[in-house]
């Protein structure tokens, strides 16, 4: 249970750390961000208070997803209606938090009063952003057991396409939910990318079954898989026989900026549903159990560092708990008690059959 609580908390910590960078327009390069952090005394001396270190829309939407998942729904359609209600309820809080534009657009299309079609939104050519990935980690907490894979796939796809009805967007939510479930299962980190790609055809099959936007999806489906396959080959972990990620000899903050931009589809690392989880995963592979190193790689770069920080922080919490993280980063965190309560509730529900 403690690690589930840590996952919810540290996702929010990663969000707050990364969001502060996104807000500082002048700090657009990882090297500069890290130098600034050192001048202020480093991570050990930071206290994340809500006034100084607010969370972004990533945490607000993640909390909304978790709240829906911890209600007493008796079928998945009821869960989706509850998600719609939660998202519509909090959407007015989002504009001041610099949200992924597709999140706002998607929430505007939700129909809480339409019982049958509440969560059916139109295909969105611009719905490929990171916002689906950053609100879905808790789905992996709720359905982490291997025998719940089918449910995890369905819920993460539906949750994702409520706001990001585009394969690059909603496959991001599948990816983060799967990574969280793999962490909870104790699966070796180096296998996660391969096993996630093996689940993508199951998501495609589910989308075909639900007969929504199949033609539009087909056109964009390949992009997500191709980007991830390329990444796994670059790190030499695409085959089952490969069990150690290989990094370049020189992979400092400046080189990482270039690499993150290369992975992106528009030159801003972490902007889309494929590369926000990718940067977080890359950071976890390189950082091991070092929270500081994780922050340098996932929370302090010139791209969408709030998105990558949210995903990386959540996964780190589930893998390693809170012991390796300075207390000041979470003791006064915005919505701390709510996040801990949701983590505990998700743990309890995930261990009961439903």
From Swiss-Prot:
Q: Which UniProt keywords apply?
A: Cytoplasm, Phosphoprotein
Q: What is its main location?
A: cytoplasm
Q: Is the Cytoplasm keyword given for this protein?
A: yes
Per the record, its GO cellular-component terms are: sarcomere
Keyword Cell cycle found: no
InterPro entries tied to this protein: ADP-ribosylarg_hydro, ADP-ribosylglycohydrolase, Ribosyl_crysJ1, Ribosyl_crysJ1_sf
GO MF entry, a single one:
magnesium ion binding
Q: Set out the biological process GO terms recorded for this chain's protein.
A: cardiac chamber ballooning; cardiac myofibril assembly; protein de-ADP-ribosylation
Query: Source organism's superkingdom?
Result: Eukaryota
Q: Which residues carry this modification: Phosphoserine?
A: 27
Give the matching SUPFAM superfamilies. Answer: ADP-ribosylglycohydrolase
**Coiled coil regions in record:** none
Q: Could you tell me where this protein is found in the cell? A: Cytoplasm, Myofibril, Sarcomere
Please describe what this protein does.
Answer: Required for myofibril assembly and outgrowth of the cardiac chambers in the developing heart. Appears to be catalytically inactive, showing no activity against O-acetyl-ADP-ribose.
Family as reported in the entry's similarity comment? Belongs to the ADP-ribosylglycohydrolase family.
This protein is called: Inactive ADP-ribosyltransferase ARH2
**Annotated source species:** Homo sapiens
This protein's gene is called ADPRHL1
């Amino acid at each position: 249970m403690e690690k589930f609580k840590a996952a919810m908390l540290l996702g929010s910590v990663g969000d707050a750390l990364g969001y502060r960078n996104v807000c500082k327009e002048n700090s657009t390069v990882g090297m500069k961000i890290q130098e600034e952090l050192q001048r202020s005394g480093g991570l050990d001396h930071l206290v994340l208070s809500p006034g100084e270190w607010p969370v972004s829309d990533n945490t607000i939407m993640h909390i909304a997803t978790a709240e829906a998942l911890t209600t007493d729904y008796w079928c998945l359609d009821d869960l989706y209606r509850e998600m719609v209600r939660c998202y519509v309820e909090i959407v007015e809080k989002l504009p001041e938090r610099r949200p992924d534009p597709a999140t706002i657009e998607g929430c505007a299309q939700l129909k809480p009063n339409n019982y049958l079609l509440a969560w059916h939104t139109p295909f969105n050519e611009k719905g490929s952003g990171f916002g689906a990935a950053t609100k879905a980690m808790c789905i992996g907490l709720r359905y982490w057991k291997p025998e719940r894979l089918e449910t995890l796939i369905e819920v993460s796809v539906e949750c994702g396409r409520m706001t990001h009805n585009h394969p690059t967007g909603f496959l991001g939510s599948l990816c983060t939910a799967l990574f969280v479930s793999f962490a909870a299962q104790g699966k070796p980190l180096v296998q996660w990318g391969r096993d996630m790609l093996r689940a993508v055809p199951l998501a495609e099959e589910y989308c075909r079954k639900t007969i929504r936007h199949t033609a539009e999806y087909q056109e964009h489906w390949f992009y997500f898989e191709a980007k991830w396959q390329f990444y796994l080959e670059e790190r030499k972990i695409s085959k089952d026989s490969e069990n150690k990620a290989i990094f370049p000899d020189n992979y400092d903050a400046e080189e990482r900026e270039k690499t993150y931009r290369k992975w992106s589809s528009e030159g801003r690392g972490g902007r889309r549903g494929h590369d926000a989880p990718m940067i977080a995963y890359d950071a976890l592979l390189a950082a091991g159990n070092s929270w500081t190193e994780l922050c340098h790689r996932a929370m302090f770069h010139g791209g969408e560092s709030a998105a990558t920080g949210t995903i990386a922080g959540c996964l780190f919490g589930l893998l390693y708990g809170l012991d390796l993280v300075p207390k000041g980063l979470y003791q006064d965190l915005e919505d701390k008690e709510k996040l801990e309560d949701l983590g505990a509730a998700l743990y309890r529900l995930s261990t009961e059959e439903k």
